[in-house]
């Protein structure tokens, strides 16, 4: 450990965003809006070097994400490399492009965990949100195949105003598939979700109803062995205090983008902060010594009202990316906090959710064509 910063612990979780390529077009994905101009991807050898450096520092878990990580032909090799180093390995996938042959290959490579995402509980809505008419049946087949290969079935449903009212059907589908773990995560408003926020943010009434449904199912499932873990994540737009984002800036989590930029969270590349590349620096140098990773560590950077707040060690001042997106200054208090001078922006978004009538086909979908239009415009 760098003796100049003895209080900084090493990262425990590495997210390898292998690619921005993806066969689905979810309008809520957290990838950057200008992903289409990010053409380069780290090679197999470069990724393995990243894994080696992260493991040497003490990281214990790695997530393979994207885009869709399945489009990388070297995925089995990357899994094997990470597993041989002692990582707990997790594949985060849409299931599109997954086959039983690939599941076999991943198992042989040592993959520990597979999470498959769904857009909805029925084929029509799933197709509308994914931009892929065949996605739903493929996801069903692969969820069953993952279970048949001895993996726990871990499902993720991203919730928003267009599908949250079918949360009971979503849970029923999870029970029908004999899922072990289900994450019902209301979309977090970064990247494409922030672009489409007006058309995605549920109303407070929708959130309350969904919470009641989840509570009823938890009571019903208690003791049955079904859905041992049913997690419901609500949007912080209906909270009065911000989330402790990533467990603190540069405290636990380290993400590497397809072209090798190292970030303290998924969305930080949008900030007016210079972040280093794994092609030019070691992870040790990046984690302990880089400007980007030290920018919002600890509490010294905080302005008021965060600096004197008794809750700062719990929420770390909230989300820097959200502060930047909403106020234009990442140093500001997260507007979710009722103590923030910008909290009115959150109140206005809640009110807007009660009035909007944006339909699914009016959302801006995450695809290369839309991305090119955005960054060229």
UniProtKB/Swiss-Prot annotation:
GO terms for molecular function: 4 iron, 4 sulfur cluster binding; cyclase activity; metal ion binding; oxidoreductase activity; S-adenosyl-L-methionine binding. It catalyses: [PQQ precursor protein] + S-adenosyl-L-methionine = E-Y cross-linked-[PQQ precursor protein] + 5'-deoxyadenosine + L-methionine + H(+). [4Fe-4S] cluster binds at residues 22, 26. Pathway: Cofactor biosynthesis; pyrroloquinoline quinone biosynthesis. Keywords: 4Fe-4S, Iron, Iron-sulfur, Metal-binding, Oxidoreductase, PQQ biosynthesis, S-adenosyl-L-methionine. GO terms for biological process: pyrroloquinoline quinone biosynthetic process. Binds 1 [4Fe-4S] cluster. The cluster is coordinated with 3 cysteines and an exchangeable S-adenosyl-L-methionine. Residues 8-224 form the Radical SAM core domain. Its EC number is 1.21.98.4. Catalyzes the cross-linking of a glutamate residue and a tyrosine residue in the PqqA protein as part of the biosynthesis of pyrroloquinoline quinone (PQQ). NCBIfam families: PQQ_syn_pqqE. PANTHER family: PQQA PEPTIDE CYCLASE, RADICAL SAM DOMAIN PROTEIN. Belongs to the radical SAM superfamily. PqqE family. Interacts with PqqD. The interaction is necessary for activity of PqqE. HAMAP family: PqqE. This is PqqA peptide cyclase.
